[in-house]
Amino acid sequence: MAKITFTGGDDFGEKLAQLSHADARGMIKRAVKRGAAPVADAIKEAIRALVVTEEGYERHGSERHMLTSITKRQKEGLLESMGIASIREDKNGFINVKVGFDGYNTVKTKKFPQGQPNALIARAINSGTSFRKKTRFIDKAVKKTEAQSIKAMNESINADIREIFEK
């Protein structure tokens, strides 16, 4: 019968014990935040690529003449308000982060005297309305960066684990 002897098993066991006592929630939160960054960057790039109306103001759209562009001020509002929200943990223990729009732009209307809500404008552009042709800039950016986001999260988790094992 052959005999195999392993050395260093105690060290490995200690490292596994350290890993089991590590701040797993903190590791996950850092990874999720890092995974959101490429998505946010891609959405900002997609906003920069949106077509702006030549006149500087948005004409009224209709079912026959669908809007396909936005105003310069709407675009600026989207770029300025785009960001990553703080990490949240829901009641089921899932750790989430939202990438999206906050606040209002400078286009004041009778309906929106404080300015148009940036989230409303983004949703209208992305999904379309009865008078605006949809331009799926958010959906495309998210799909385009999915693998990059997962890779960033994996790298973050692996770096945290490596740090524990190198102590």
Q: What residue ranges belong to the model's regions?
A:
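Short, Lys/Arg-rich flexible segments
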Residues: M1-V97, Y104-T106, Q114, N118-K167
